[in-house]
Amino acid sequence: MFKKRVFSWFGFKKNKTKINDLDDHIKKNNQDNLSQKKCNNICSQDSIAKSTKSDCCSENVANSSAVNESHSSSLMKLKLKQHVSHVNNKNSFLLTLTTKLVRTKEAFSIKLKNLFFKKKTYNSLLDDIEEQLLVSDIGVRTTRELVDSLIKVSTQHELKNLNLIIEILKSKMKKILNKVEGPLNINYKNLFVILVVGVNGVGKTTLIGKLAKNYKKKGKSVILAAGDTFRAAAIDQLKLWGEINSVSVITREIGSDPASVVYDAIKIAKLKCIDILIIDTAGRLHNKNNLMEELKKIKRVIHKIDSTISQETMLVLDACIGQNSIKQVKIFHESLNVTGLVITKLDSTAKGGVIFSIAQEFLIPVRYISFGEDFEDIQVFNSNIFVNAILSNNTLK
């Protein structure tokens, strides 16, 4: 950095004596010569300063250029590293799902492959493919669309090409699931509330533990509310997840009004500037109106405390029950306006195809899929990865 130079301009006083006065004339000449020397010195110094400044600027430009090149190189390396990490993550997710979804994959890939070992006519092969899709619990509507896509695209000769058939099915399946691929976008500027609902035994509390762990890893503050006040075991289980994840759990005594627990939890969460509040609720049959009314009351309490609170009503579904999930989604959605779905226990069933029926029947985003008891056994739903996992190429060779 260069300081500004302040240049003083020198003036000269007029000689009050007569010009013919020799002494004064000589004195004036001496003063003029002295002033001229001072001016010359100033000009010389100014010239040197400009030269020095020019040299320094050139050096700064060179240094700046080198820094920019270094920064650009570092940025390129960072982007490349992020891209490689993204690709590795996708490959890791695919490998994990392919391993975990063994039963669903067997229902699709392996049994479909076995159809091609025997000589079949065009129509009989189509019938067998249709039957296998139905057995996979993919649903009548989706099965019909998949078979129709095979008829439109493939000829009698091409239908005997297993790899071609698989690619046609994968393309159509991805189009169906793309409509419900919707990660949960959380606005961390205000408290975000996740109300977890579902029937008994679908894995709500385990899911809450996984979500808490996931958001904590992202550096977000989380608090849990034990809205299932009917079972002491439910409260104890949620407390255990809270201890494991080092998050607070808001509870009340057994038999308390669940809405009062939610009220306390929201007040505390807002007071402590918590990012995410996850509410556990009692498992209930979807045909019990009084229990559904209780969930509606909880939603009203949330809105009454603060109408600006962002809220997700997350319905948890057990993949093991197959097509029965359709009725659950219908009832819960009509009563509570479900905003997101989670499909659990995909590792324990061959009925994972139900996700296609749900996607066709309802346009509710699938937030997560879960496939085990470990914290890592949960993934944000990705339609491409899911379809590639259940129709993985290594089972077709």
Curated annotation (Swiss-Prot):
Which GO biological process entries does UniProt record here?
SRP-dependent cotranslational protein targeting to membrane
Q: Where are the transmembrane segments?
A: none
A GO cellular component term found in this entry reads:
plasma membrane
This enzyme's EC code(s) = 3.6.5.4
Indicate how the chain sits in the lipid bilayer: Peripheral membrane protein
Residues engaged in binding GTP:
198-205, 280-284, 344-347
Q: Where in the cell is it found?
A: Cell membrane; Cytoplasm
Pfam families to which the protein is assigned, alphabetical: SRP54, SRP54_N
**UniProt-recorded Gene Ontology molecular function terms:** ATP hydrolysis activity; GTP binding; GTPase activity; signal recognition particle binding
Tell me where it mainly resides.
membrane
| Annotated keywords | Cell membrane, Cytoplasm, GTP-binding, Hydrolase, Membrane, Nucleotide-binding, Receptor
The source's domain of life comes to Bacteria
InterPro entries, alphabetically?
AAA+_ATPase (IPR003593), P-loop_NTPase (IPR027417), Signal_recog_particl_SRP54_hlx (IPR013822), SR_rcpt_FtsY (IPR004390), SRP/SRP_N (IPR036225), SRP54_GTPase_dom (IPR000897), SRP54_N_sf (IPR042101)
Q: Which NCBIfam families match?
A: ftsY (TIGR00064)
Q: How is this protein organized at the quaternary level? A: Part of the signal recognition particle protein translocation system, which is composed of SRP and FtsY. SRP is a ribonucleoprotein composed of Ffh and a 4.5S RNA molecule.
Q: Which family does it belong to?
A: Belongs to the GTP-binding SRP family. FtsY subfamily.
Its biological function?
A: Involved in targeting and insertion of nascent membrane proteins into the cytoplasmic membrane. Acts as a receptor for the complex formed by the signal recognition particle (SRP) and the ribosome-nascent chain (RNC). Interaction with SRP-RNC leads to the transfer of the RNC complex to the Sec translocase for insertion into the membrane, the hydrolysis of GTP by both Ffh and FtsY, and the dissociation of the SRP-FtsY complex into the individual components.
Q: Provide the protein name.
A: Signal recognition particle receptor FtsY
Q: Which organism is it from?
A: Buchnera aphidicola subsp. Baizongia pistaciae (strain Bp)
Q: Which gene encodes it?
A: ftsY
